[in-house]
Structures are given as C-alpha cells and as structure tokens.
Regions:
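Mg2+-dependent endonuclease catalytic cores in nucleic-acid-processing enzymes, primarily RNase H-like
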Residues: 1-123, 157, 167-185
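Extracellular low-complexity, Gly/Ser/Thr-rich intrinsically disordered linkers
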Residues: 106-159
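Short, Lys/Arg-enriched, Gly/Pro-containing loop segments at transmembrane-helix junctions
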Residues: 161-165
Length: 185
C-alpha cells in the first residue's frame, strides 16, 4: 500500500499493522533514484534485508518498526511504460481488457500523467520521470507500478530481467564438516 503520501503515511502503517491480513500487507515507498544517485544494485545489503529487482524490504528497526518495501520509481515506471508499448499478444505485453476505449479514458489519462527525461550521470543513463502540470492525477500510474513491484516480489519476472543469484556452496552435513576439519588440521 502506497505510504508515500505524507498525510496518510501513519494511517497506512497503522492499517498494515492492525489488519487481519497484516502478514501479507506491506507499506510501500517509491524512491526517486536519478542518474546521479546510488542505484539500488549498489546499496549495501544488511542482515535481514530482502532484495529484488530494484526493490528491497529492509530489516525492521526504528520509529515505525514494520516491514515495508522501498523501490526505484524511475526504473519501475520505465519498466511499466515499456510493457504498454509491447504489441498485443507479444511476450512482455501489458494489455487492458475490453474493446471500448471510453471505459478506460481516466486510467489512460492517469497512466500518461508523467513523462520521462533521459539523463546521464555517474556513468549511467536513467529515465527520470516528471509530472505533467496539466495532469496532476497519477494515482492509477502509482497503482500500476505498485502492482508490478508486488508481482516481482512474488517471483514474477520477464525473461532477461532476473537478477543472477549469488552462487551458493552446497550444504554440508555436520558429519561432513567434522571430516573436513580433521583433514585441514
């Protein structure tokens, strides 16, 4: 649940804590990650953090002491808009149901309420998203992006967007560890 709107942040946190569905609800915070700021891939991972494709659930500590997700809004808005640009039926397409455009007019207006400016800094290029002054409502865009982040958190991914996992050494039994220790002495 979007917890970035200042007036409702505490309400969202309280709802996520007190809901009968608290085990599966997370407040979310989109963060502007521009070309000159540190990308999510370079954040230092702390014990207890859950990290995914341009999102992370930090270990809980501090004032609100509740699990929450933080994600790179620029990356996820670009990802979501790219899905809308894929031809119907092709892999990676995001399609809207029905065949009556008038039924989706408000959704379309809000999903296009922002535009990006491609910027460069620190050796990387990033689409930085800005609000259109004539279209102040972007609630459906925020919801759509939040759904994409949520899907990623649940394991959904497109070919080529998966993060290479850290190579894990095979698990050893206690007996094997003892044998290995004796060999090394």
């Amino acid at each position: 649940i979007d917890a970035n709107w200042g007036h409702s942040t505490n309400v969202v946190y309280q709802f996520c804590r007190q809901s009968p569905h608290s085990a599966i609800l997370l407040p979310s915070h989109g963060r502007f990650v521009g070309a000159s700021t540190i990308p999510f891939s370079e954040y230092k991972r702390r014990p207890g953090d859950r990290v995914g494709l341009n999102w992370r659930v930090p270990s809980i500590r501090g004032k609100r002491a509740i699990r929450h997700v933080i994600y790179d809004t620029n990356w996820w808005k670009s990802f979501t808009h790219a899905r809308l640009g894929v031809a119907m039926g092709d892999r990676g397409c995001l399609s809207i149901f029905g065949d009556r455009p008038d039924a989706h007019r408000m959704f379309a207006e809000q999903v296009t309420a922002e535009y990006f400016i491609r910027t460069e800094g620190r050796g990387r290029t990033v689409d930085e998203w800005k609000a259109r002054p004539e279209q102040p409502d972007n609630h459906w865009l925020d919801c759509l992006v939040g759904c994409a982040v949520g899907a990623s958190m649940q394991g959904a991914l497109l070919f080529g967007t998966d993060i290479p996992s850290a190579r894990q050494s095979p698990r050893l039994s206690f007996n094997e560890l003892q044998k290995q220790k004796r060999r090394d002495q």
